[in-house]
């Protein structure tokens, strides 16, 4: 079934599937996207803090060496620091004087030995030109600057930290630091994206789409999960995105039943399909994309079972995406996905056919096959922060219930986070046949709802998951994910097979 046009992102308007492999995008930040809006973010965080005075102090990620080695751990900037600076450089610090609306970035002091071996660190002039800041200073002046601020501060002003152990290198009084409010304030600020952030996530998705397409074009020639992971990474790097938002999951066959499978080293053999969960990171912003497709030269599903489960998950995703708009409780969308899963598995006989959809839903048995939430925020982290998780309940009187590891239905209606315009969330339904989970389910009361003889036919599938990144707009949604799926993905496999046979 072809995905509804409404479920596609607009990023490839005018570009058909046959042309996507020839489409090379310019991913440099151009005239439409200015410098990273650090000052805007700082003001937003100060507003969430609800105070008019104080000094926010953040320390960036320092250079860290591997244990017992002279080699460094690959650098990854602390995301809270990046949100207030846009600086993807090690060994930096920043301060933001709330009363003066003054943002200062501290860069590493010049080190000749470092320059000879590793190249020069960023200079003051380069920092002022590159970043949306009011001032740039060398790190050696940090202690003097903060001490000077303390002498001039009012009695009600504090230095505001993310964590108690992130204190600046100064002599201090115990009551000088406030360490409880900055994390929730920054989480609330980061949950709703601005136009710059949306553009970065859109670009990350474009790169991911190109990489997923490259895999579809070559899947008929591949023999091992590592072939998939290697080509995906190579394609991302070629298009200006050398970092992945998370570890690539290239799970073939029953490995797809492990949600975060990352070994990526097994031969396909006679396996049916691949669950590829992989997303590029662009300028520190994540994409999160999952596609499931047959291991096939013909672009056809090898068995009715894997085809039927794919179509079930496809229905789950398409219906849920259409529900996305401001004011919707994401938990309600998750429950709709669960209900669709029950309906489909009941039709296939995986659930005993003498049971009703309502009875199965009330039992929580669907959690054996759909054990995770429908989605999460995406941003500077692949599982990004927000004032509240989209799957979180806020009503303590209605706790979630669990039965030996399985997340069950809510005991009663729950007050959960509402979607807001400019949030970006994933919609990633899945159906899985995990042998250990189902073995455990045999010992639970929910076993009476499951036909374990029928389940045997579905184990070779492992799992099917489809995942897109969805921007909440003023009136609904926009799908930022461009990676082909459904019939479009199968067509790419078919065309590539024809080209390969002619070569």
UniProtKB/Swiss-Prot annotation:
| Entries under PANTHER family matching the protein | XAA-PRO AMINOPEPTIDASE 3, XAA-PRO AMINOPEPTIDASE AN0832-RELATED
Q: Which family does it belong to?
A: Belongs to the peptidase M24B family.
Q: What is this protein called?
A: Probable Xaa-Pro aminopeptidase TSTA_094700
Q: Which cofactor does it need?
A: Mn(2+)
Q: Which domain of life is it from?
A: Eukaryota
Task: Output the GO biological process annotations, alphabetical, semicolon-separated.
Answer: proteolysis
CDD domains in the record: Prolidase
Role summary: Catalyzes the removal of a penultimate prolyl residue from the N-termini of peptides.
What is the species of this protein? Answer: Talaromyces stipitatus (strain ATCC 10500 / CBS 375.48 / QM 6759 / NRRL 1006) (Penicillium stipitatum)
EC number of the protein? 3.4.11.9
The record lists Mn(2+) 2 as bound by: 277, 288, 467
At which positions is Mn(2+) 1 bound? 288, 428, 467
Q: Which InterPro entries match?
A: Aminopep_P_N, Creatin/AminoP/Spt16_N, Creatinase/aminopeptidase-like, Pept_M24, Peptidase_M24B_aminopep-P_CS, X-Pro_dipept-like
Q: Which GO terms describe its molecular function?
A: manganese ion binding; metalloaminopeptidase activity
Keywords of the record: Aminopeptidase, Hydrolase, Manganese, Metal-binding, Metalloprotease, Protease
Q: How is the cofactor bound?
A: Binds 2 manganese ions per subunit.
What the entry lists under Gene3D superfamilies is as follows:
Creatinase/methionine aminopeptidase superfamily, Creatinase/prolidase N-terminal domain
Pfam family of this protein, just one?
Answer: Peptidase_M24
* Reaction catalyzed: Release of any N-terminal amino acid, including proline, that is linked to proline, even from a dipeptide or tripeptide
């Amino acid at each position: 079934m072809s995905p509804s046009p409404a479920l596609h992102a607009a990023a490839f308007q005018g570009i058909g599937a046959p042309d996507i492999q020839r489409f090379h995008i310019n991913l440099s930040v151009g005239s439409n996207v200015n410098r990273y809006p650090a000052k805007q973010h700082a003001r937003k965080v100060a507003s969430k803090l609800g105070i008019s005075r104080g000094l926010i102090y953040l320390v960036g990620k320092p250079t860290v060496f591997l244990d017992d080695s002279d080699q460094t751990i690959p650098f990854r900037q602390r995301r809270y620091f990046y949100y207030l600076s846009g600086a993807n450089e090690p060994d930096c610090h920043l301060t933001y004087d709330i009363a003066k609306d003054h943002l200062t970035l501290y860069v590493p002091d010049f080190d000749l030995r470092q320059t000879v071996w590793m190249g020069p660190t960023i200079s003051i002039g380069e920092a002022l030109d590159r970043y949306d800041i009011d001032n740039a200073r060398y790190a050696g002046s940090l202690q003097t600057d903060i001490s000077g601020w303390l002498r001039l501060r009012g009695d009600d002003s504090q230095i505001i930290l993310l964590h108690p152990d992130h204190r600046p290198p100064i002599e201090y009084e115990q009551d000088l630091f406030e360490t409880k409010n900055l994390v929730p304030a920054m989480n609330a600020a980061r949950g709703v994206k601005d136009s710059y952030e949306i553009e970065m996530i859109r670009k990350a998705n474009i790169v991911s789409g190109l990489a997923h397409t490259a895999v579809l074009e070559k899947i008929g020639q591949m023999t091992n999960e590592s072939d998939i992971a290697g080509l995906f990474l190579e394609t991302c790097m070629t298009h200006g995105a050398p970092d992945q938002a998370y570890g690539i999951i290239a799970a073939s066959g029953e490995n797809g039943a492990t949600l975060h499978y990352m070994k990526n080293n097994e031969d396909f053999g006679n396996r049916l399909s691949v669950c590829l969960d992989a997303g590029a990171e662009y300028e520190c912003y994540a994409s999160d994309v999952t596609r499931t497709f047959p291991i096939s030269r013909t672009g056809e599903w090898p068995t009715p079972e894997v085809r039927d489960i794919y179509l079930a998950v496809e229905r789950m995703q398409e219906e849920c995406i259409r529900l996305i708009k401001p004011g919707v409780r994401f938990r309600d969308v998750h429950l709709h996905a669960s209900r669709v899963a029950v309906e489909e598995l009941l039709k296939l006989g995986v659930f005993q056919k003498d049971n009703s959809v309502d009875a199965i839903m009330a039992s929580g048995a669907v959690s054996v096959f759909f054990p995770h939430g429908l989605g999460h925020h995406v941003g500077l982290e692949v599982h990004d922060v927000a004032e509240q998780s989209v799957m979180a309940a806020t009503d303590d009187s209605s706790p979630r219930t669990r039965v030996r590891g399985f997340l069950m239905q809510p005991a009663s209606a729950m007050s959960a986070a509402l979607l807001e315009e400019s949030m970006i969330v994933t919609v990633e339904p899945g159906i899985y046949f995990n042998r250990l989970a189902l073995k455990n389910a045999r010992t639970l009361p929910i076993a009476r709802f499951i036909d374990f003889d029928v389940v045997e036919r579905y184990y070779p599938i492992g799992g099917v998951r489809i995942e897109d990144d969805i921007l909440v707009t003023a009136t609904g949604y926009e799908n930022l994910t461009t990676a082909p799926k459904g019939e479009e993905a199968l067509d790419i496999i078919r065309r590539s097979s024809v080209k390969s046979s002619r070569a």
